[in-house]
Amino acid sequence: MSKTVVRKNESLDDALRRFKRSVTKAGTLQESRKREFYEKLSVKRKRKSEAARKRKKF
């Protein structure tokens, strides 16, 4: 869980920007999107294989 404390004399926009940066750096949104729905093992393997194929292609 990302936590951001608003500093003294800091605008809310700046604090929100720091929070968003910390969330993306931690990968929280990606992880929650990935776990939103159950993914069958066969589908997961297929997706992983496709990603490896794309990486190898370039």
From Swiss-Prot:
Identify the InterPro entries for this entry.
Ribosomal_bS21, Ribosomal_bS21_CS, Ribosomal_bS21_sf
Keyword Endoplasmic reticulum among record annotations: no
Membership in a protein family? Belongs to the bacterial ribosomal protein bS21 family.
The superkingdom of the source organism is Bacteria
| Identification of the protein by name | Small ribosomal subunit protein bS21
The record's listing under Pfam families reads: Ribosomal_S21
Which HAMAP family is this protein grouped with?
A: Ribosomal_bS21 (MF_00358)
Q: Which Gene Ontology molecular function entries are recorded, alphabetically? A: structural constituent of ribosome
Example GO CC term: the record gives: ribosome
Q: Which UniProt keywords apply?
A: Ribonucleoprotein, Ribosomal protein
One biological-process term from Gene Ontology? translation
Keyword field contains Cell membrane: no
